[in-house]
From Swiss-Prot:
One Gene Ontology CC term in the entry: cytoplasm
Protein name: Asparagine--tRNA ligase
Gene coding for it: asnS
Similarity-based family: Belongs to the class-II aminoacyl-tRNA synthetase family.
Stored NCBIfam families: asnS (TIGR00457), PRK03932.1 (NF003037)
Species of origin: Actinobacillus pleuropneumoniae serotype 5b (strain L20)
Length: 467
């Protein structure tokens, strides 16, 4: 064992009682007793709990330094690991030396002083908020989920591919994209028609931040069979809500020779795998969320893992909603895009389990989704989860070139702009499927937090790009 074990390694019993170690971290709290002892709670971010360090007043720097320590000071505490008589943790550290590495300049104005802060306030000091119990726990859970996703796809034989963040294609055909340009805004070049001349821009054409890695991912799926992307995506959607971010991460698998049924099975297997991982690997953080954020968060994940997914056609789901007798805020009729209240009714009240809604009307779905034989619906699916609604959206992709071209024209897109995507249908086309999972929405579901801005380190939203 290293001379500098983590707090996690010490508290989990990987360091033997009686061993001399040095703990490097930050002071959470300091408490002094009349018996001439100080109790320092030192954390290093490796786990939820700090380690208690007992410091005797015979240390050389006890009066000059130890008694001045406040929340946030960085220290190296050397001492012996001993069994703790106190409740809460099995071991503690009996200090023989305390080195102060960094002081908090003015404890009275330190934004992370040892008191409870509102979540709204923490957003204003996002550069310091990972020091709190809440955001520290979110960060560890986020890491655990990301690692579990990579592990799952690797075990399933998928290859990770890096798709570009700068693109000339709009995957969703929605037009809500951030433009990338180096043109001088005060002296824009113009065409003869008076439009901005993007041929003089850095890439020689209009370019944007990507809204999805899907189209690029499909090119590799049609060569490597099974691939996935996992990276940042961007939407210039002017939505200042608890569910939207302008910059967020997406998990997007694509696999060849796969039907919509295969797609639904992959989504179910992946979600259950990562939920199981976080419950096993981050028990301390999940217990914190269950105690302070949402008391049902652990049982919700356990129930999700245990429940087989229900499946229902969109048309049947509309019938269920119409016959429910409930008065929804958004009226129900065939052809609407299901709103959050519809999704949650289906998952929470009707099926009481995760549910895959499939075969949506073509007019409310993207051009690349496979047209069904009825000519009215496409082989699309949404996975709805109790407690949040839609958590995954996907489809079988349209592999027939003539049908794809027709769909593009119907959606007002120029097939020539997607010449490279169309090539996949010209040269050895194959049925293939995939889905998208908003990573931050997954973390919101796992932690029970109400606002997506708490689960990404530096949230980007309308009129908010600080730090």
């Amino acid at each position: 064992m290293s001379k500098f074990p983590t707090v996690s390694e010490i508290l989990s019993g990987k360091v033997a009682v009686g061993e001399e170690v040095a703990v490097r971290g930050w002071v959470r709290t300091r408490r002094d007793s009349k018996a001439g002892l100080s109790f320092l709670a030192v954390y290093d971010g490796s786990c939820f709990d700090p380690i208690q360090s007992i410091i005797n007043n015979d240390l050389a720097n006890y009066n000059d330094e130890v008694l001045r320590l406040t929340a946030g000071c960085s220290v190296i505490v050397t001492g012996k690991v001993v069994e703790s008589p106190a409740e809460g943790q099995a071991v503690e550290l009996h200090a023989t030396h305390v080195e102060v590495v960094g002081w908090v300049e003015d404890p009275d104005t330190y934004p992370m002083a040892a008191k409870r802060h509102s979540i709204e306030y923490l957003r204003e000091v996002a550069h310091l908020r990972p020091r709190t119990n809440l955001i520290g726990a979110v960060a560890r859970v986020r890491h655990c989920l990301a690692q579990a996703i990579h592990r799952f796809f690797n075990e399933q034989g998928f290859y990770w591919v890096a798709t570009p963040l700068i693109t000339a294609s709009d995957t969703e055909g929605a037009g809500e994209m951030f433009r990338v340009s180096t043109l001088d805004l005060e002296n824009l070049p113009r065409t003869e028609e008076g439009k901005v001349d993007f041929s003089q821009d850095f890439f020689g054409k209009e370019s944007f931040l990507t809204v999805s890695g899907q189209l690029n991912g499909e090119t590799y799926a049609c060569a490597l069979s099974k691939v996935y992307t996992f990276g940042p995506t961007f939407r210039a959607e002017n939505s200042n809500t608890t569910r939207h971010l302008a910059e967020f991460w997406m998990v997007e698998p694509e696999f060849a020779f796969a039907t919509l049924a295969d797609n639904a099975k992959l989504a179910e297997d992946m979600l259950k795998y990562v939920f199981k991982a976080v419950l096993e690997e981050r028990k301390d953080d999940m217990q914190f969320f269950a105690k302070h954020i949402d008391k049902d968060v652990i049982t919700r994940l356990e129930n999700f893992i245990a429940a087989p997914f229900a499946q229902v056609d969109y048309t049947d789901a509309i019938e269920i909603l119409l016959k429910s007798g409930k008065e929804f805020e958004f009226p129900v009729s065939w052809g609407i895009d299901l709103s959050s209240e519809h999704e949650r009714f289906l998952a929470e009240e009707y099926f009481k389990s995760p549910v895959v809604v499939k075969n949506y009307p073509k007019d409310i779905k993207a051009f690349y989704m496979r047209l069904n034989d009825d000519g009215k619906t496409v082989a699309a699916m949404d996975v709805l989860a109790p407690g949040i609604g839609e958590i995954i959206g996907g489809s079988q992709r349209e592999e027939r070139l003539d049908v794809l071209d027709t769909r593009m024209v119907e959606m007002g897109l120029n097939p020539e702009d997607y010449w490279w995507y169309r090539d996949l249908r010209k040269y050895g086309t194959v049925p293939h499927s995939g889905f998208g999972l908003g990573f931050e929405r997954l973390i919101v579901y796992v932690t029970g937090l109400q606002n997506i801005r708490e689960v990404i380190p530096f949230p980007r939203a309308p009129r908010n790009a600080n730090f």
